[in-house]
Regions:
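Phosphate-binding site recognition
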Residues: 1-301
Length: 301
């Protein structure tokens, strides 16, 4: 059962019903329910589904891709030598499919782009020379490494420039959606309790899924965050590591803003965090904003 996400589901259904091939990008911070959203929307049924391997090298990624092709009915094939060959096999699978719309779901795609793999060039070629030339392919890519999605796909200046037809940022739940989620799990909580939970966990569905019925707010928080074996004890560092390459400066920005409490101007942030006034800093701030960690408020006067 999906709580909220009405707009995202509507757009995915619209892409599926389109008379043309469509390219959808689903992205957002870790634990926010991106994969669950896509799988639930399509009832866990895809022409091809694959997920990148965390910290796997190119050979590991290609072997996993081969295995996903086999799971999709490709039959026994050798491990591709490179990504061009891998996507050539995917083209064969799509040609063989009798489905009206061929839904291709590639999850955790940033992990597949290993050094010197030419992965982005291969997926550019797959889309531009094959999928977009047909009318029956829905390509959905998904990832938590938002900076990769933004810079390598959404702001691509090469073969993927302006190719994405559906851009779906998945944001944390609102307070109302968190209340609906708690009701769906039959966990009773007063409005005050909900507010306390929201101040601790934000609107991240995975965190709320760990709450135990019958425990108080303090008991749940202590068990999940402060206990030695707490499931969220090390979540802070793991979260930034999963989202950003070289996350230290991202963490510094968020920590400085958190300590200030009332917000900071860009110039204040640059000075306080020891950043350089350049495009790299702009990209970091944009990445954090896209992930929902910070919010830019224009000043007037």
């Amino acid at each position: 059962m999906i709580i909220g996400r009405d707009k995202e589901q509507r757009e995915l259904h619209e892409a599926y019903e389109s008379e043309y091939s469509e390219f959808a990008v689903v992205y957002g911070r870790r634990r926010v329910g991106k994969t669950f959203l896509v799988r639930e929307t399509f009832n866990y049924t895809f022409t091809f589904e694959h997920s990148g391997v965390a910290k796997g090298n190119m050979r590991v990624q290609l072997r996993a891709f081969r295995d996903s092709l086999a799971d999709a009915g490709m039959g026994k094939v050798k491990v591709p030598e490179d990504w061009m060959e891998a996507f050539s096999l995917l083209r064969q699978l799509i040609r063989q499919s009798k489905e009206r719309k061929k839904v291709v779901f590639i999850d955790e795609i940033p992990w597949m782009d290993t050094p010197r793999s030419n992965f982005v060039s291969a997926i550019e070629y797959f889309w531009n020379n094959f999928a977009s030339a047909r009318k029956d392919v829905l390509l959905i890519i998904c990832g938590s490494a938002t900076s990769w999605i933004i810079n390598k796909v959404l702001k691509n200046h090469g073969g993927l420039h302006n190719r994405v037809t559906y851009r779906l940022p998945v944001m944390p739940f609102t307070l109302y959606e968190c209340e609906q989620y708690m009701k769906s799990r039959k966990i009773q909580a007063s409005h005050y309790d909900l507010l306390e939970y929201y101040m601790v966990f934000g609107g991240v569905p995975f965190y709320w899924s760990l709450l135990t019925r019958g425990q108080s707010v303090a008991q749940n928080v202590d068990r999940l965050i402060f206990a030695e074996d707490g499931k969220l004890r090390y979540e802070f560092n793991e979260l930034y590591d999963s989202l950003f390459h070289n996350p230290e400066k991202y963490v510094r920005i968020v920590m400085e803003l958190g300590e200030k409490g009332s917000g900071m101007t860009r110039d204040e942030l640059v000075k306080q965090c020891g950043l350089e006034e350049n495009g790299r800093t702009s990209r970091m701030l944009e990445d954090l904003e896209e992930c929902g960690f910070i919010r830019k408020i224009p000043t007037y006067g």
